Every structure is written in C-alpha cells, then in structure tokens.
Amino acid sequence: MALTVNTNIASLNTQRNLNASSNDLNTSLQRLTTGYRINSAKDDAAGLQISNRLSNQISGLNVATRNANDGISLAQTAEGALQQSTNILQRIRDLALQSANGSNSDADRAALQKEVAAQQAELTRISDTTTFGGRKLLDGSFGTTSFQVGSNAYETIDISLQNASASAIGSYQVGSNGAGTVASVAGTATASGIASGTVNLVGGGQVKNIAIAAGDSAKAIAEKMDGAIPNLSARARTVFTADVSGVTGGSLNFDVTVGSNTVSLAGVTSTQDLADQLNSNSSKLGITASINDKGVLTITSATGENVKFGAQTGTATAGQVAVKVQGSDGKFEAAAKNVVAAGTAATTTIVTGYVQLNSPTAYSVSGTGTQASQVFGNASAAQKSSVASVDISTADGAQNAIAVVDNALAAIDAQRADLGAVQNRFKNTIDNLTNISENATNARSRIKDTDFAAETAALSKNQVLQQAGTAILAQANQLPQAVLSLLR
C-alpha cells in the first residue's frame, strides 16, 4: 500500500464504516424509543402501506363496534317502551272481557270505558315521547334506519320501527259491526238464510276460495276461513233482539234450536219470561239472554250458531215473538220480524249470525252472488279498526275490542320479536368485529412494532461498532505521521 499524506484511504474507509454504524445506532435508538419498527417510509415502504391499511381497517372496526352498540341501545329503548304498550293493551283486553260479561249494566260498562279511554291516551303518549338521541322511535317517523356496522361502505344492519300509537295499531276487519238474516220456512225446518257460493280471500300473498254451502251457520263459515290466509282469524257471532208482545188469554209455546240442540219453551207470556227460560237452558243451547236498562232483550250465540224458532200450538188467542237482527251498519233493524205468532200454522224461523275477520295486515274479501254481503255486510277491502276506536260501553263493542286488541298485541309482539332478533344480530356483529379487529391489530403489530429483543441486540452491536470505529479512526488518522520518519 502506498504511503501518502494527501489521501488517507484507511481513514476514509473507517469513517464510512463509522458513519454506517452511527446511522444504524440512531435507527435502533429511534425504534426503541418510539416502539415502532417502521417510523417512516424509508424504513419499510411496503410494510408502511400495509400497516396503514390495517390501521384504517382497525379504526373503522372500532367505530363500527360503537355504532352496533348504539343500535343495541336504541333497540332496547324501543323494546322497553313496547313492553309498557303491551301492559296497557293487556289491561284494555281485561277491561273488555269484564265489559263483555252479561252481569254488567250500561253504567258499569260506561265506567269501564272511561279507564279504556285513559289507557288509549297513555298508549299514544308513550309512542309520541319514546326517543333515542333526539329521534322519536314509535310515532311512525322512524321508518327504516341503517346502522353502519362495518369498516367499509354499505356494511349495514337495518332497524324498522312502526307507529305504536293507539290510532295506528289494531286489526284490519271485515264485518266488524255484524250482519244477520231472518228467514221463515213453512213446515219442516230446512237450511235457509245463507246461499251457496264462494267467498274469495286475498292477503298475505295468497288467494283462497272458500266454498259455502246453503244454510251454513256463521260458525261453520268462520271455521273454514280461520287461518285460510296468513295472520287471518275469524270469529262468528249471532246477535239479535227479541220482544214478546200482545199475549192475551194464555201463553205462547215454541221450540228453540241452536246447532243440534232443541229446547221446548212453554207458557211464555212476556219478554222477561222468554229471557228466563232461555237462560235456564243456556248450558244446553249455548246462548245467553240479557235485558238492558231499557228493557230490550238481546240474545247472543257467542259461537255464531244458527238459532231456529219453531212454532207450536199455544193457548194464547193473540201475541207474538218478534226479532230484530243487527245490520251491516251495526244497528238493529227498525222493523221487527215475527218469528212466533199465536194461532199461526207451524213454521220454522232461522236467525243467522255474522262472521268477523281480523288480521294485523291488510286483505280483501269478495264473493260470488250474495255470499260476502250475507256474511260480512258490505264486504270489500278490510278496514283498519284501531285501538283508539274501541268502545266497550256495549257488550258487542267489548267483543269487538277483544279482537282488535288481540291483533294489536300480535303486531306489538312481532315488532318486539324483530327488535330482539336485531339485538342478537348486533351482538353477533360486535363479537365478529372485535375478533377481526384483534387479528388485524396483531397483524399490524407484527409488521410495524419494534421487536425489542432483536433491536436491543442490534443496539449493542452498533454501540460496540461505534466505539471500535472511533478507536480505529484515531489509529487510521495517525498513518500519515509515518512519512515524518522518512524525512528525518
């Protein structure tokens, strides 16, 4: 190796190596003080890109987890309010059952209706005041809302909330006021009152054609229609008023047949006498007779059986039993029809009932001939009968209220079931998000974080190299001094 003064190759080489070890030492110190292996793009360009992408995902997952927790809280708030609504509806139903009992007077039912009105108002108040984060949940304005539960666009879970006010929940009804017919047949009793034909039910994505035989009772028709389309329930009733008048010189005798059971009534002289004899045979006939404060006798078959009156020879020289059936407008007909009259030939009179259809969802009814109107009154698209409209101040109104409240409860229960399902869905989503976030964080750590064991070893190595390089540089810088020995 040449001996020179102007150029000290050994020193330059030592400086280069010392500079490299110094840079490595600085890098180790930075990694150990920050805890990150990658502090800038120069440390690992590809690793920085991957770790940043993972950081974005982790941040999004954490936000999505908070969003899902908000969804659970909202669903719990709505579900809690619906629980109170359920309690109110159950109370209204209890009151309706109490009002439907024949032991109540008109004044009793009016008092019960006052509590129903208060419960109706509270039901609406709950729907109007239930809020979460400033948003009303049960007044019908919420609709369907999406919750972002993922770190990417359109990763959502939807919550739908319906209007739960008293005016919004209830039953889609046909025949809610009832309708009936009275037909007289001379001689032996035969099927009469309802003509044969078909009633068409459309709803729930299905169409069902119900065949009706001539003379079918409302009970038989209801049994055919109950559950024929999704969510549809059918209830049959026979309701009519009866009056005994003009009995002179003796009494009236006649048979009453309900379904397959017949009872002979003898010595009937007044409306009260008719009511007493019917009630004494109530367990056999399955009908009830009640006289209200105005002296009006109402006879009811809660199952919708046909009620037949068969005349016998009586001792009265004059007198009659006349009935009024309920029309499709809910009112009893103005003109009474004689079903038993003294001194007449043997006849059989058949009083038919009506069918009420209820469903929490919309449907329609039509029929061939006169079947639909005979059974349901003016049948058409089902009309919504809400909880706000129920009135239990009459026995029939109480019966209708039970059906309306039952469907309202079904709607509330369905909404609560949806909320329970979405809460479980949110919980499962949170568990999944937490798992993904944990694994993504672990992956980012392996890429970006400092391995302290390896880095402290590198630090020790670089410190030794730094010290050795400094010492060797001092020696290398002394090499040009050898020239002086040649000059002596």
UniProtKB/Swiss-Prot annotation:
Superkingdom to which the source organism belongs: Bacteria
Gene Ontology CC annotation, any one: extracellular region
Post-translational modifications: Phosphorylated on tyrosine residue(s).
InterPro entries (UniProt xref): Flagellin (IPR001492), Flagellin_C (IPR046358), Flagellin_C_sub2 (IPR042187), Flagellin_hook_IN_motif (IPR010810), Flagellin_N (IPR001029)
GO MF term list: structural molecule activity
Keywords assigned by UniProt, alphabetized: Bacterial flagellum, Phosphoprotein, Secreted
Pfam families tied to this protein: Flagellin_C (PF00700), Flagellin_IN (PF07196), Flagellin_N (PF00669)
Subcellular location: Secreted; Bacterial flagellum
Chief location category: secreted
GO process terms (BP): bacterial-type flagellum-dependent cell motility
Family per similarity comment: Belongs to the bacterial flagellin family.
Function as written in the Swiss-Prot or TrEMBL entry: Flagellin is the subunit protein which polymerizes to form the filaments of bacterial flagella.
Protein name: B-type flagellin
Gene giving rise to this polypeptide: fliC
